Amino acid sequence: MGYQFKPDPDMAVEKIRIGRVPALVVKPQKSAPDAPGVLWIHGGGYITGMKEMVYMGRAMDLVRKYGAVVVSPGYRLALQKPYPAALDDCYQTLLYMKDHAAELGFRKDQIMVGGESAGGGLAAAVCIKARDDGKVHVAFQMPLYPMISNMDTESSKDNHGKVWNTRRNHLG
C-alpha cells in the first residue's frame, strides 16, 4: 500500500494486516489511555484505493485535535471484488479494533466509525451490521457525504461533472 500524506512528528504511523486486510494505524506519539478509537474508511467511489486518495486529512485531524487512534483499512475495491467484499473488510477491521483496543491504545467502549464518500457509505453499512450482529458497540458514526445509492434522480442524470457524475456513480 502506498500512502500519501505528509509525515507529522507528533503522530505515530504503523502499517498492519488484519487477516487479508492491510490497514494504517495513526495515533499521537503520546497517546492518552482514554483515547477514542476511530475506524476511518477512505473514499474513492469503491474503485480507487488509499494511495490515490487525499481522504486521510479528516482522519489526521481527529488524531491531532482529539488524540484519537485511527485505524483505516485498505479494503478490497469493487472492480476486483464486488459487494460485499469491501463491507466485510471494514467490518473485520471493526471487530479487530474491539478485540485489540488496549494494544492499539484506545478504549473499546469509545469506537467511532466514519468515512467520506464511498467510505461514508461503508461507515453507515458497517454500523448497521454492527447493530444487527451485536458483537461490537459503535459509540458514534460520522458518514460524510456518503455514497449510499447508485440510483439517479432526474436532475442527477444530467450531471457530467469532473469529480463525480452519473457514469462514475454507476461504475462504483
Residue ranges of predicted features:
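Alpha-helical membrane-targeting segments
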Residues: M1-Y3
